[in-house]
Amino acid sequence: AFGNNVWQIVALVIGIIILMFGVGRGIEKANKIMMPVFFILFAVLGIYVAFQPGAIEGYKYIFRVDPKAFADPKTWIFALGQAFFSLSVAGNGTLIYGSYLSDNEDIPAAAGRVALFDTIAALLSALVIIPAMATTGAQLNQGGPGLMFIFLPALFKSMPGGYIVAIIFFVAVFMAGLSSLINLYEAPIATIQEKLHLGRKASCAIIAVIALVVSICIQGIVSGWMDILSIYICPLGAGLAGIMFFWICGKKYVETQVNTGRDKKLTDKFYPICKYIFCPICFLVLILGIVLGGIG
């Protein structure tokens, strides 16, 4: 259970070094490389896998429509859970990255672009991974790490120059994981800077030591508790944040925030729709997710 300490330490050290340069420079530099690499790689892989025997079954699985599934509450619970995970709605990313936005940034438009490109990335991934599974005769309803670490390497192996592609791909995966690690650590680092009035490097060093000691001590026993955190606590916290923003902060505050940086104000219907329709439905689905399972 404690065999991954070395790689855990390596990832932590790299993340802290990037954070010492500041989130604006460190994360931005990493993401400017990571995002184009991911999109280009998946586009190339999508074209390649389309010509492999059996890939058509993967496409049929992806685009098959089951009308009965739309009436199943779990379908919507799973969809919301995927949105929480993929968009990091329940994570520190929204808080941290949002705090670095310029006052001239059109937040609703930026949120729309994030959702659009996230959906494109998810579709590209599906158009590669599911057909790749179909070419090997695997069960297409499988999930978990095997999707990336078993079926994609098999696809790389069949490609001309596949070893080079595999190296580039998993470097990009590493960078994606690193960007997630960075936004998780940025919140406590920023808190120490603000509350204790310490410098950036000193704050990073304190969090690094605490994270290193705690993570090594609990590595072998943490998986069950992490499931509880990601499946229940984070989505619940996100739902409460939505209620606080739309129900407690008040209409004037909300409209001021969402219209900052926009050339044209949002419709007056935005606030009542979010307050009286979106938030209650979202919170209801969160509760159903906790009861029935599926979010996270």
PLM segments and residue spans:
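Loop-to-transmembrane helix boundary motifs in multi-pass membrane proteins
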Residues: 5-6, 117-123, 163-166, 175-178, ...
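Hydrophobic alpha-helical segments and their helix-loop junctions in multi-pass secondary transporters
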Residues: 39-65, 214, 240-256, 287-295
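Alpha-helical transmembrane segments
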Residues: 184-198, 221-224, 243-267
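A generic transmembrane alpha-helix motif of multi-pass inner-membrane proteins
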Residues: 223-246, 264-296
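Membrane-water interface regions at transmembrane-helix termini and the short interhelical loops
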Residues: 12-34, 96-104, 187-195, 217-224
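Hydrophobic alpha-helical segments of multi-pass membrane transport proteins
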Residues: 175-184, 204-214, 230-258
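Inter-helical loop and helix-membrane interface segments of multi-pass membrane transporters/permeases
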Residues: 1-20, 24, 56-77, 142-149, ...
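Membrane-embedded translocation segments of transport machinery
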Residues: 28, 32-178, 202
